[in-house]
Every structure is written in structure tokens, then in C-alpha cells.
Swiss-Prot record:
Residue runs in coiled coils: none
GO CC terms: cytoplasm
One GO biological process term: cell division
Species per Swiss-Prot/TrEMBL record: Chlorobium chlorochromatii (strain CaD3)
Record-linked Pfam families: Trigger_C, Trigger_N
Entries under InterPro entries matching the protein: PPIase_dom_sf, Trig_fac, Trigger_fac_C, Trigger_fac_C_sf, Trigger_fac_ribosome-bd_bac, Trigger_fac_ribosome-bd_sf, Trigger_fact/SurA_dom_sf
Catalytic activity, EC: 5.2.1.8
Protein name (Swiss-Prot/TrEMBL): Trigger factor
Purpose: Involved in protein export. Acts as a chaperone by maintaining the newly synthesized protein in an open conformation. Functions as a peptidyl-prolyl cis-trans isomerase.
The record's note on its domains: Consists of 3 domains; the N-terminus binds the ribosome, the middle domain has PPIase activity, while the C-terminus has intrinsic chaperone activity on its own.
GO molecular function terms attached to this record: peptidyl-prolyl cis-trans isomerase activity
Key words, A-Z: Cell cycle, Cell division, Chaperone, Cytoplasm, Isomerase, Rotamase
Location(s), subcellular: Cytoplasm
Native organism taxonomy: Bacteria, Pseudomonadati, Chlorobiota, Chlorobiia, Chlorobiales
């Protein structure tokens, strides 16, 4: 066998393999015998057609089959021996048979060779979220909202109330358009933006009050930016009249031991333990958020500083992944008429960053000689089991070591090792940060 590896780009190579008759002959004869046994040629019984006629009719398909089988076999042997890291399956670009030789040309993408920029001088700020009593009470209030009751209020609408009213639009002549009436529309004061004209007009109003609302749409330019007065077309404000019919207020239940049992499905039987768990869950959530935000900052910096060429097949793979993630968020399907092709194309830059970051993390693992052992998997399983006493540690270990889960768990462990290897070299300054508010 003769081989020649030719670089086509930093991420693509061509491999030429020349096999002698002794090397390709057995496979060729095997395919020829199979064709002789199975191919039916009119005028001849199966297996009795002249060899010359059989080669003439079935020869091209035999040659393709032989080229594909031997191409795959020798490609695997060669990349292993040459320590080549392919990024995709090799494609046969060309092949040629003679009586004495089979010449194969394979094209494939590779993980590029590159030197990682020194990152020991990088500095990052990590948020240190402090969960206090205020944050715990705020979270409990959110939980209680799902168990609250909407009751009618005779008081003026507050920032947490819902105003129910009949809305009518004024026409161009300044008269109310009865055809535009929307009865019993619910305006949630809590979730409308502070600058929303309906929120501004309805705050402090009671049942029976009538308000006029002027809504002026914001004109945007073709790029989605807010247009200036000079280049924007005149946008007519729309006037509405809203007659308040009712103000609803969410009445929260009292948090007691019985409600705790219901909310927690008997996990807790008293308020103190429930509050302690809420605090723990918040701390774990914001610790994870802090870690993820730091990782995002690190990856962004390292991707920016290391413009590594990325194999196209890797980028396309990440495009597919991002597309599927978006689809799952929409219950598995995009809306009818959605431009999937255009949407996929718009994600290419993001996909390229994901692919580049993957190459960088592989380089960090290689530089630090990081590996994942069975002991690592056991330790990972023990840590996960510690989060839930109901879990059986032996069963978790068996599951994590099973073929269905092993690669995924090993990848998770490797990511953590790479993260630790990076954070040990960079400077990370913790900064006390208020816990952000969130709404249901």
C-alpha cells in the first residue's frame, strides 16, 4: 500500500491510497462471486453467465462497493497510525481500477492543529449572589401566588392588581367605534411595563371609572432600530376608552404547616423546614448561575483570542443542535410557513463559536493530560446521590457506567475538569451581587 496525505486547508485533507492487486484482489473477487450468485442476466441461469459479460454489466457497481469497503478500512488504519483527528467521515472523491492497482482519493475534515494563546493573565469577575431573608420571602410569595385566590377589590387599583374593563377605540373622526369593543379585557398591572400607557392610565382607578388612553406605536427602521424624528414616517397615535368594570386582587393564603405539606407534597411538615429548603434551592440556583455566567465570560474571551479555523461539518452539527433546541422550545414544531432555512443560516455565527469553543476545550484537556476514569464516574455519582437521599448510589453508578449513559457522563465530568483547569490559571474576583428579581 502507498499513501499520500495532502493538506487542502487547515481543516481539510486529501488522502490518496494506492493498493496492489494482492491487496484489493480478494475483496474484488468476493464481490464478483456475490454478483455471479445473485445477478440475473437475461438468457442465462443465475451463476452461469460468462464472466466477461458479468464484469461488463455489474463491474461498475462491484468497483464502487470495493472502493467504499477498502476506502473505509484503510482510512481507519491510516488515521490511527498517523494520529489524525477526523471531524467527519471521509468521502470518496475519486477512484480508479487497473489490472494491477486500485487508486483511491478520500477527502475529509480534521481538527486543526493550533497553539492556544496564554490565558493565565485573563481576569474575570464572578457574581457572588447573597440570598437573604428578603429573597426567601420573595420566592415564597411567588410560590403562594399559585395557591392564591382572585377576589374583587373596592379599593383603587394597585401595582399588583388586575383591572378588568371594556375597551373601545376612537375612529379617525374622534368617535367611539362600537365594532372595536373588547369586553372584559384583563390588564395585569404587575406584568405590564412601567411605561405602558394602559398601566399608567389605570393605576389608582376603581370600578365605574372611565379613562382615555393614547397609545403611540414606536416606529422602527428597516434594521429594527428605533427611527429618529428625521427619518421616521409620521405615526398616528391610537386613542382608546376603557371603562373599568372590576378590580381584582390576588389574595394569598397564610403559610402554615398544613399548606407546607400540600405545597411540598409531604416532603416537609413545618414552615421552618420549608423556608430552609427554599433558601437552599435559591442558593444552589444562583451558585449555578454564577458558575455558568463565569464560564460564558471565559469561553467568550478565549474564543475571541483564539480564532481557530473550524471544520464546516462541526459548524453544521452545532447548527442542527441549535435548531432542534429552538424547535423543542416551541413544543417540537415551528409555526406553519416559518423560514427554517433562513433561521438555521442566521445561527451559523453562534454555531461557529460553539464549535471553536469545543476545539479550545479539547486543547486544554490535551495540554493538561485530562482523562476520565471509573473512579471519576463513581465520585460524580456519589455527588449526585448526595443531593437526594432517596437515590440508590449503587444503582446510579451502574446507570452512569452503562453504554447508554457512559459517554454523556464522561463528557460532563471532562467539561468540569476543563473548567477547573482554566479557572485555576486565570484571576477570578468575586463581587457581591444582588439576587435579581424574577416573575412567574
Amino acid at each position: 500500500m502507498q499513501k499520500t496525505i495532502t493538506p487542502l486547508s487547515p481543516t481539510e485533507q486529501e488522502l490518496e491510497i494506492i493498493l496492489s492487486a494482492e491487496e484489493f484482489g480478494p475483496e474484488y473477487n468476493k464481490e464478483l462471486d456475490e454478483a455471479k450468485r445473485t445477478v440475473h442476466i437475461k438468457g442465462f441461469r443465475k451463476g452461469h453467465a460468462p464472466m466477461g459479460l458479468l464484469k461488463k454489466l455489474a463491474g461498475p457497481s462491484i468497483e464502487i462497493a470495493v472502493a467504499e469497503k477498502l476506502g473505509g478500512k484503510y482510512f481507519t488504519d491510516i488515521i490511527t497510525a498517523e494520529n489524525i483527528k477526523p471531524a467527519n467521515r471521509a468521502q470518496i472523491a475519486d477512484f480508479a481500477f487497473t489490472d494491477d492497482t486500485l487508486t483511491l482519493k478520500l477527502v475529509y475534515e480534521i481538527h486543526p492543529e493550533f497553539e492556544l494563546q496564554d490565558f493565565s493573565g485573563y481576569t474575570f469577575t464572578k457574581a457572588n449572589y447573597v440570598v437573604g431573608d428578603k429573597e426567601v420571602e420573595r420566592e415564597i410569595e411567588l410560590i403562594l401566588k399559585s395557591h392564591g385566590t382572585m377576589v374583587t377589590s373596592d379599593e383603587p387599583a394597585s401595582e399588583k392588581d388586575t383591572v378588568i374593563g371594556d375597551a373601545l377605540r376612537f375612529n379617525d373622526e374622534g368617535e367611539l367605534d362600537e365594532a372595536s369593543k373588547v369586553a372584559n379585557h384583563h390588564f395585569s398591572m404587575e406584568y405590564l411595563p412601567a411605561e405602558n400607557p394602559f398601566r399608567i392610565a389605570l393605576l389608582g382607578k376603581k370600578a365605574g371609572d372611565v379613562v382615555e388612553v393614547v397609545n403611540t406605536p414606536i416606529k422602527e427602521d428597516e434594521e429594527g432600530e428605533e427611527a429618529t424624528a428625521e427619518d421616521a414616517e409620521a405615526v398616528k397615535p391610537t386613542r382608546f376608552q376603557v371603562t373599568v368594570t372590576e378590580v381584582k386582587r390576588l389574595e394569598l393564603p397564610e403559610l402554615d404547616d398544613e399548606l407546607v405539606k400540600e405545597i411540598s407534597q409531604e416532603r416537609f411538615d413545618n414552615v421552618a423546614d420549608f423556608k430552609a429548603d427554599v433558601r437552599l434551592q435559591l442558593e444552589q440556583h444562583f451558585t449555578m448561575k454564577s458558575d455558568n455566567d463565569l464560564l460564558e465570560a471565559i469561553s467568550g474571551k478565549m474564543v475571541e483570542e483564539n480564532p481557530v479555523p473550524v471544520p464546516n461539518s462541526m459548524v453544521e452539527s452545532f447548527q442542527d443542535m441549535l435548531l432542534e433546541n429552538a424547535k423543542r422550545q416551541l413544543s417540537g414544531n415551528f409555526p406553519k410557513g416559518f423560514d427554517v432555512t433562513g433561521f438555521r443560516a442566521s445561527m451559523r455565527d453562534n454555531a461557529e463559536k460553539h464549535a471553536r469553543w469545543m476545539l479550545i476545550t479539547q486543547k486544554v484537556a490535551e495540554m493538561n493530560k485530562l482523562t476520565v476514569t471509573d473512579e471519576d464516574i463513581v465520585a460524580f455519582a456519589e455527588k449526585e446521590a448526595g443531593k437526594n437521599e432517596a437515590l440508590d448510589i449503587k444503582q446510579i453508578i451502574e446507570t452512569y457506567k452503562s453504554p447508554d449513559f457512559h459517554d454523556y457522563i464522561a463528557d460532563s465530568i471532562m467539561k468540569e475538569k476543563v473548567y477547573n483547569a482554566i479557572t485555576e490559571k486565570v484571576t477570578v474576583t468575586e463581587e457581591e451581587t444582588p439576587v435579581p428579581e424574577h416573575r412567574m
